């Protein structure tokens, strides 16, 4: 009677469920249990037991369902099989189930054998087997768990909770198939079973037509069917681009297209067609842009024009786009002046009045020199020096130096732009200047005394041949009535017989055959006083004494430090990184196993949550203690729901399992850090017991990286590593050892934030930073564990650092398995022999060096997590430091097999080779492109790999690097290539 009551309540909900259904894409239904109204006659096993067809009436219409509810009879194995279903064109089918499940706690005594799930199976066949039923023919699709269960109060109120689940199966290869439902002790009513496949409808997208296509998947790793489209009239595939492709998903939906069609030159897009450009408009290339109006200084265009011709006197530079106005050369520069400064001339001018309509104005300066005696002239670029290159000036001034005296110079300044080279005429102005003097000498004081001044000077080397003597004029400052003159052929002079402590004005002038050259500026130099001379002697003596004292003090300090350092080296190890004892944590972790009653630890460190605040939505995995669900948690305000992950403790648990389950929650509850998984709370007073944590959308780091192979920048990967290191630094500061640090135990959220999780193997450290915890047994993850932890089962934060180095390698290889296919015994032997994981491909040198530091055999020489965070912060702040890549040998790093047999014989087939490197999804790509034999494959280039359709950078590199080893093997055995 209870089942019929359940059926009646479900019938009330059935109509609402049908009204809410909405199909995606174009669905082709193969089986619809509800529509057949009980006429299908499905097979039950064992016959007459278990599943039963029931009928209820709603709105004078019969409603049919299959139900089973043998919850108190011990172990159950009840099967319900559909009739044989012809699959038509389908390769992948969708199975939609609508059902209800009753809460096991609603039965008297809790029904210890009661379950709340059932199993879904399928079997393929080319013929209908009739009533012949064999379990071994069926393959399990999934365990079906309800999102909502019908509890006692719901059942009494006839408020039955209806669940809807959908699964996809494929690819199918036989003519038809069966579905089967296995009951293992649940109270289930199956109201609807609908099986269908999908088609992508005919579509016009981005100027390309795509035909109606059956929604199929190429393979499990490539669930999209690629469909080629055809361009509409006057549309073309862009040069060097890909033709229009759309991907038909297994859901019957078109994804964003790859490649495109563009309206050709002279045509523009109007809705879903290409139309010729109107007169006066043009389009120069196939693109998405519309036709453009002809620019200034062009002639009117005709319909469908691809360009507009320039008016007479106007031009386009080769690099000018056709959309740019036609332009002309500029006029000459304005207001050119030449200002002489000894052997220099400064040329100044202003921009031309007419720029020709362009902004790329540059100036070119040429020089001509003339000898006054003969009147001969010639170019002078080789003998003069410009302040900047003279033929591509953007400024409106330039200084010309090294000019010869008594010479006439003419300078021409030409204005040019991008079209000046298309005409023969020039636009320039000239300025002339006569140089009558040499450049002024540069004077400096070399030495002085109470009665003398030693003065030196210099002039340009090019002018020294014209100077025959130098004239030095000097006088006392303030005496305008007398002065002294000394002449010399050299570049220095000592002025004697001067008064002590007196300032003199000194000027040097060059004398040439033609007359006086330019004079230097007047310098003020002062002789020493008699007291100053004596003081200098005293100061000199004091300085020597001070120097001697400093030398003696330095020697003493050196000896003292040498002795102290020697004692330090004799008493302690040479630790290269910071000492953790310098920073004591503000908070210390408490081991929940020290509590006699684990409930006390739960009460102290966690928040108890009532199960009514938690909603389980779907199974996302299975943990050590039970199933893991994605669900929601009502906030304390009761209005907002947040997504959470829910770990459940399975029925029939032992006391040890209960203690370990609650201890993990007590451990997590003590941590609060951005890079540690956050505990929301626990359900410990109701069954099933639950641990509720924040929900991490991208799941485990290793699986996430394998799915996103090659999609992240190096900076993003280093950012992930920095987050993990920050979390481990926090744990180390709390005197806490993780013991199982690996990429599989790092969770990633939607913002790529990485958080440390899984504290099942973790243990506490004592107050001493170098204390260890010795385990009493249990499995150790060999590939991630430090050698001292493997050999002596002693774990420290230093052993966590070793594991962190392995995580770094996993991240940089996008989730490759450490040490590949080596056995655990081979891994331990290799590590003890000094082998370390080789450089990942495209790994920055600084990152690999940090890995090697983490893998130091002596644990005291490994960096602390604080050091690692600091190093990664510096690398992130200076991204250029990540551009230097470590040396990489693909045949060592990837260790992809290049032969199929032990005797070094190359792979016999291309598919065998691709399967060995886990790239079998590209087998069809190689076959279609004509690479059907190994001899052809080894001739492929990187461009060939891209051309056949391998688009992911990580997959391109994996195939390319495997080819290197393959070529070596082929050459070794002498196969011609």
UniProtKB/Swiss-Prot annotation:
Residues 887-977 are annotated as: Negatively regulates interaction with ARHGEF16. One of its GO terms (molecular function) is ATP binding. It catalyses: L-tyrosyl-[protein] + ATP = O-phospho-L-tyrosyl-[protein] + ADP + H(+). Its EC number is 2.7.10.1. The modification Phosphoserine is found at residues 571, 580, 870, 893, 898, 902. Keywords: Angiogenesis, Apoptosis, ATP-binding, Cell adhesion, Cell junction, Cell membrane, Cell projection, Differentiation, Disulfide bond, Glycoprotein, Kinase, Membrane, Nucleotide-binding, Phosphoprotein, Receptor, Repeat, Signal, Transferase, Transmembrane, Transmembrane helix, Tyrosine-protein kinase, Ubl conjugation. The chain crosses the membrane at residues 539-559. Changing residue 957 to A: Strongly reduced binding affinity for INPPL1 SAM domain. A motif (PDZ-binding) lies at residues 975-977. Disulfide bonds join 69-187, 104-114. Residues 607-907 are annotated as: Mediates interaction with ARHGEF16. Residues 905-969 form the SAM domain. Changing residue 958 to C/K: Abolishes interaction with INPPL1 SAM domain. This is Ephrin type-A receptor 2.
């Amino acid at each position: 009677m209870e089942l019929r009551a359940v059926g009646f309540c479900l019938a009330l909900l059935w109509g609402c469920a049908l009204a809410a259904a909405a199909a995606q894409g174009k669905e082709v239904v193969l089986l619809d249990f509800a529509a057949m109204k009980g006429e299908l006659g499905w097979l039950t096993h064992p016959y007459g037991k278990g599943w039963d067809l029931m009928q209820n009436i709603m709105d004078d219409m019969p409603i049919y369902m299959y139900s089973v509810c043998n919850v108190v009879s011990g172990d159950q194995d009840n099967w319900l099989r559909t009739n044989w279903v012809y699959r038509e064109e389908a390769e992948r089918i969708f199975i939609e189930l609508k059902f209800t499940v009753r809460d096991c706690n609603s039965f008297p005594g809790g029904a210890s054998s009661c379950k709340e799930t059932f199993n879904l199976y399928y079997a393929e066949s080319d013929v209908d087997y009739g009533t012949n039923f064999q379990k071994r023919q069926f393959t399990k699709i999934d365990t079906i768990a309800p999102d909502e269960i019908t509890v006692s109060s719901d059942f009494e109120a006839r408020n039955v909770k209806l669940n809807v689940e959908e699964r996809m199966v494929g690819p199918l290869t036989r003519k038809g198939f069966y579905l089967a439902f296995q009951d293992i002790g649940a109270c289930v009513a199956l109201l609807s079973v609908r099986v269908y496949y999908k088609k992508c409808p005919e579509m016009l997208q981005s100027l390309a037509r795509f035909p109606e296509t059956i929604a199929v998947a190429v393979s499990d790793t490539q669930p999209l069917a690629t469909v080629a489209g055809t361009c509409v009239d006057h549309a073309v595939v862009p040069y060097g681009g890909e033709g229009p492709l759309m991907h038909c998903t297994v859901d019957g939906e078109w994804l964003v297209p790859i490649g495109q069609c563009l309206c050709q030159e002279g045509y523009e897009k109007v809705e879903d067609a290409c139309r010729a450009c109107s007169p006066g408009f043009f389009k120069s290339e196939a693109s998405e842009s519309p036709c453009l109006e002809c620019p200034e200084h062009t002639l009117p265009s005709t319909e469908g024009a691809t360009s507009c011709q320039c008016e007479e006197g106007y031009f386009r530079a080769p690099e000018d786009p056709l959309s740019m106005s036609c332009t002309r050369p500029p006029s000459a520069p304005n207001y050119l002046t030449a200002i002489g400064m000894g052997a220099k001339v400064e040329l100044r001018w202003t921009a031309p009045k007419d720029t020709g309509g362009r902004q790329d104005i540059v100036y070119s300066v040429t020089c001509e020199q003339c000898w006054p005696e003969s009147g001969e002239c010639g170019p002078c670029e080789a003998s003069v020096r410009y302040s900047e290159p003279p033929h591509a000036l953007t400024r409106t001034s330039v200084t010309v130096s090294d000019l010869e005296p008594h010479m006439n110079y003419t300078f021409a300044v030409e204005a040019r732009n991008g079209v000046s080279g298309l005409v023969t005429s020039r636009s320039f102005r000239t300025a002339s200047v006569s140089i009558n003097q040499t450049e002024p000498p540069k004077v400096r004081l070399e030495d002085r005394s109470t009665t003398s001044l030693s003065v030196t000077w210099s002039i340009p080397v090019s002018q020294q041949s014209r100077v025959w003597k130098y004239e030095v004029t000097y006088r006392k400052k303030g005496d305008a009535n007398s002065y002294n003159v000394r002449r010399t052929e050299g570049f220095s002079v000592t002025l004697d017989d001067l008064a002590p402590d007196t300032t003199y004005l000194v000027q040097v002038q060059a004398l040439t055959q033609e007359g006086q050259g330019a004079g230097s500026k007047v310098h003020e130099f002062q002789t020493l006083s008699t007291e100053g001379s004596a003081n200098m002697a005293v100061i000199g003596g004091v300085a020597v004494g001070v120097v001697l004292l400093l030398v003696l003090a330095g020697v003493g300090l050196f000896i003292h430090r040498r002795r102290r350092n020697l004692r330090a080296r004799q008493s302690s190890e040479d630790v290269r990184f910071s000492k953790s004892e310098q920073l004591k944590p503000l908070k210390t972790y408490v081991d929940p196993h020290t509590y006699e009653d684990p409930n006390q630890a739960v009460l102290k460190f966690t928040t108890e949550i009532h199960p009514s605040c938690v909603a389980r939505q779907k199974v996302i995995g299975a943990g050590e203690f039970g199933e893991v669900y994605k669900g929601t948690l009502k906030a304390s305000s009761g209005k907002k729901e947040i997504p959470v992950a829910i770990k459940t403790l399975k029925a029939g648990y032992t006391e040890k399992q209960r203690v370990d389950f609650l201890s993990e929650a007590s451990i997590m509850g003590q941590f609060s850090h951005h890079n540690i998984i956050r505990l929301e709370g626990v359900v410990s007073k109701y069954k099933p017991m639950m641990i509720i944590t924040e929900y991490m959308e991208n799941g485990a780091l290793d699986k996430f990286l394998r799915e996103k192979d090659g999609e992240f920048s190096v900076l993003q990967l280093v950012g992930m590593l920095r987050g993990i290191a920050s979390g481990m630094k926090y744990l180390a500061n709390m005197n806490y050892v993780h013991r199982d640090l690996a990429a599989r135990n790092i969770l990633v959220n939607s913002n790529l934030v990485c958080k440390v999780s899984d504290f099942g193997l973790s243990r506490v450290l004592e107050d001493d930073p170098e204390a260890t915890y010795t385990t009493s047994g249990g499995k150790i993850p060999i590939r991630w564990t430090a050698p001292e932890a493997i050999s002596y089962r002693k774990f420290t934060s230093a052993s966590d650092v070793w594991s962190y180095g392995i995580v770094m390698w996993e991240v940089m290889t996008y989730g490759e398995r450490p040490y590949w296919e080596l056995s655990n015994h081979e891994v331990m032997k290799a590590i003890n022999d000094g082998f370390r994981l080789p450089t990942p491909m495209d790994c920055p040198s600084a990152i690999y060096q940090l890995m090697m530091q983490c893998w130091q055999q002596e644990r005291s020489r490994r960096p602390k997590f604080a050091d690692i965070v600091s190093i990664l912060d510096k690398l992130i702040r200076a991204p250029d430091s990540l551009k230097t890549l470590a040396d990489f040998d693909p045949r060592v790093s990837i260790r992809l097999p290049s032969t199929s047999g032990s005797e070094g014989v190359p792979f016999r087939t291309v598919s065998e080779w691709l399967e060995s490197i886990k790239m079998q999804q590209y087998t069809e790509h190689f076959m279609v492109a004509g690479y059907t034999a190994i001899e052809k494959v080894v001739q492929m280039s990187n461009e060939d790999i891209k051309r056949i359709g391998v688009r992911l950078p990580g997959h391109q590199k994996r195939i390319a690097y495997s080819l290197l080893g393959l070529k070596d093997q082929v050459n070794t055995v002498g196969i011609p290539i």
